[in-house]
Amino acid sequence: MSQSAFGSAARINWKELYKRAIKLPSKRVGHAIEDWVASQSPMGNSPVIDAKTFDWVERLEKSSDVIRQELLALLDAQKHLPNIQELSPRQMNLSREDGWKSYFFYVLGHRIDASYRRCPETGKLLDSIPGLALAFFSVLAPGMHIKRHRGSYKGVLRCHLGLIVPEPRTSVRMQVADKMIYWEEGKCIIFDDTHKHEVWNDTDGIRVVLLFDVCRPLPRWLTAVNKFVLSLGGYLPEAHRLLRTQREWEARSAALANPL
């Protein structure tokens, strides 16, 4: 082969080739699948869903004071909850600051027993929610901004139960697609996180929600497929890393609370 041929090969933009040959077609297929899944669901492709659609919402909202008391006890005992980037490194793409803390209860079929022991009433309420896939306290520090992003799986809906919402409420907000949302203490917000969304806390106080995912309502056969796919997610390395890191944090916290 001539040197010019080698030179031509060297000039190939392999990154662009990968993008055109694999990444973009895969993304188009993924979006087509998402659109089809949405078409099978009673809420369609709506970015924000009426919380009254789910009968467990009223029960959860009525119990928000109990959950808040357990949260406050946790925050009082544990001044330094883990940063979400420690538990899930890919969240570094959204924020590299130390102002987004988390405390997990449930991850894709794996219950974190230590969290249930610390917050037993919260745990009982989570267990009563059908199709629970993920659950944690999400704590956002003053001045925090979570960049615009989207979830990767259409089979779940994301729920936020407002627990601590600082004033002015209009300065702590989330945009989902073209809709601006403001949290309210004791109220649930439900949205499809495959729509791009962004979060701001432009107040002097922390914002805390109980964040959890539930299975999207689908026909029975598709619900079975959806639950199977979610159960496989529990075996992914990232899920196991998150569980391991949270358990290590719990062990360190227990050791500090009960020194020899």
Residues covered by each model-derived region:
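Fe(II)/2-oxoglutarate oxygenase catalytic core
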Residues: 1-150, 221-260
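Short histidine-centered beta-strand/loop micro-motifs
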Residues: 125-127, 146-153, 172-174, 200-202
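Short, conserved beta-strand element in jelly-roll/cupin
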Residues: 139-141, 152-168
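A short hydrophobic beta-strand segment most commonly corresponding to one strand
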Residues: 158-162, 190, 205-220
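Conserved metal-binding segment of the jelly-roll/cupin
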Residues: 181-196
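Ligand-binding loop in jelly-roll beta-barrel domains
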Residues: 195-209
